[in-house]
Structure formats: C-alpha cells, structure tokens
Amino acid sequence: SKVVEIKDLTKVFDFINETALFKGQWQYKQGRKSKEEYQQIVEETVLPKYKEIKATAIREKLLEAKLVYGYFPCQSEGNDLIILEDDENTEKQRFTFPRQPLEQRGSKNLCLADFFASKESGKIDIVPFHLVTMGRRASEHSAKLFKNDDYTDYLLFHGLSVESAEALAEMWHKRIRTELGIDGND
C-alpha cells in the first residue's frame, strides 16, 4: 500500500462534478426557472462563489487531499471476493456482494465478484482498493461554521469538501485504471 498527498488542489478540483455540487450539495436548482434564468444565476452567483470558496480553501489550507491505495491478490467464489495474503494461498479477507435482482429491467444478475478470476479457475487476480480524505481541517472548519450559525458558508464549504473527496476518489480511480492498463477511453 502507498500513502499519497496531493499538494495541488486544482488537480482535484478538475474532477469535481459541478452538477452534483451546485444542485445536490448547494441546492441551486432550476425549479420553475427557464433554462436561461437558471444559467444566469449560475454565472452571476454560483460560479463566483465557487471560485471564491476554492481560493479560500487553498489559501487557508482547509482541504488536505490524501489517500491510501494498493493492489491485492484475489479470487472470487460465488458472490464472494476473497482477498489473499501476499503468498497468494492464504485467505486474508472475504467480502460478500449482492447480485442484481433478476426482476430488475435489463439485469444480467451480475455480482461484483463475477468480474474477478474464480477460485475454481486457479488463476490469481488483482483488486485495487483506495481510501480518500480531504483531511481533519475540512471537518473542523465545517464544524466551526456550523457552531457559529454560519449556515450558508457551512453549506457551501461542506458541499465543496464532500464533492472534493468524491473528485479525489474519481481522480485516483482514473490513475489506478491507467496503472493497470485498463484505462481505454478514460
């Protein structure tokens, strides 16, 4: 496993899903407004606030993008993904995953374990895992804003920190796919 710290937050911000941030986290929704009216709100209110809060987060070092990731030998058995010790013989951990319900439209009744080499095949596969964080300061700053009844800034900063964590996960998922040579059209 490796621990990584991303110093340049703009690289993480490039992966932010702005729709999820603006509409989901920040609640700037079109509602009954016309497309043009909504776009005007986004351009005049949302984007300047977004730019400002990102600059503040960088300047005050409120977000600390860190992650740990690694590649682990594995095999599958039914709905289980079996993580193996480095010796590739000893079971270290077993995860059981659900299968898509047959009655779900278009379902192929797949399970995550189906995408890994089976124990029965005798082949050893690799599974990557990664965990991300935007750091303790993000949580502390959010808590401080909330405690001080600064709900608007709390909502904006907390939303940015949540979506930044999602962006970091997406960014590193892309990196893992590249390292594994399965990035295709990423």
Language-model segments: residues:
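Active-site loops and adjacent core secondary-structure elements that bind or stabilize anionic groups
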Residues: 1-155, 159, 180-182
